[in-house]
Amino acid sequence: MTTTHWIAMLGLIGAATAGDARAQTGTDIFMAPLRQTGRNVTIGAPVNLTHRAGYDNQPSFTPDGAALLYTAIGDKGQADTWTIRVANGATPSRVTNTAIGVYSPTVMPDGQSFSVIRVELDSTQRLWKFPLGGGEPTLVLEPIKPVGYHVWLDANTVCVYVLGRPATLNIVDVRTGNATPIASNIGRALVKVPHHDAVNFVQIVPDSGQWLAEYDVAKRSVRRLGRLPEGADYVAWTPGGALVTAAGSRIYRWNDGVWAEAADLSGAGVRNISRLAISPAGDRLAFVAEDP
């Protein structure tokens, strides 16, 4: 059985498929100060938090913003959840010790558990949860598989990317397991819109590239907002309502239908930025980039 080994010193009471992780070796997690003034977003000098050869990816902040949960693949190819405090010089600590692997750790709305995409012994990928205080995992969605990515909208509702041809986006009531398909041909980015009952995702449009789209839960409607910059796959919101994305070494901010450059981190040796996470206070940006 899988167990968690939660580090009490953290003082804590936010997916990718296995194939995706294996294909993206050689990544580190970086942290940079972030400041939002009106519509402007400023990104400071980044610090490499994980700084090792191998796969360190899928960061998400804890509710207090003091630490990150993330996925790391060890020397034996096993993917597990790790944690690291955001203070400079902090040492990563292992949280799970699994037989095959878990991905995309995200603290759940109840603040008592974190959810993961767990690869089971028969290679099935489903949504599970672990207690933050340590203990055995529990299956969250029994019938829905294979799950690749997920984001929580509230304590009873989760938005999941279900692998397939095409991949589909589904809103699921975890109390009943009832799933409502809302889109297909989607990318890997799933983020909740702050202060709104809505979720952003990437819509892949043939011959037109990747578009940022939004699903309004109350209206049950999808609208396209605009194309992503070339090479961008992920987005993140600040608590103050600024939407950012990244491509190459650059961070961009959404500004009235146009992506405006917020920072060029090439001078810091940052290459191929992918996943993004912003702290609950909006003062830090965590991102994934290639190993230096």
Residue ranges, per PLM feature:
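Bacterial N-terminal signal peptides that target proteins for export
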Residues: M1-I7
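Bacterial N-terminal signal peptides
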Residues: I7-A15
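Sequence signature of WD/YWTD-type beta-propeller architectures
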Residues: G19-P292
